Amino acid sequence: VQDFANCARMARRAGYDGVEIMGSEGYLLHTFTAPRTNRRRDHYGGAFVNRIRLPLEIVREIRRTCGRDFLIIYRISLLDLVEGGMEWEETVQFA
């Protein structure tokens, strides 16, 4: 979480208006949100609220670190298109 926030802080210092976090298409954060790939048995796995915990922690820490005027774009997959992926209802709730 802190590494994401540190990268965002460096982007802000370099003059960028915001960052885009890749949470789609099989990237690391997508593997946390998709039931098919998230087989964790801790507070980051299982129930939907647990599977979205890491992305939410990251976004909140970037917001805390960089301020309300810093743009944060979080890219999600609309539909996983694989058996066992995030369902439409979960995707809408996550968005």
Predicted regions and their residues:
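Flavin-dependent oxidoreductase catalytic cores
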Residues: 1-95
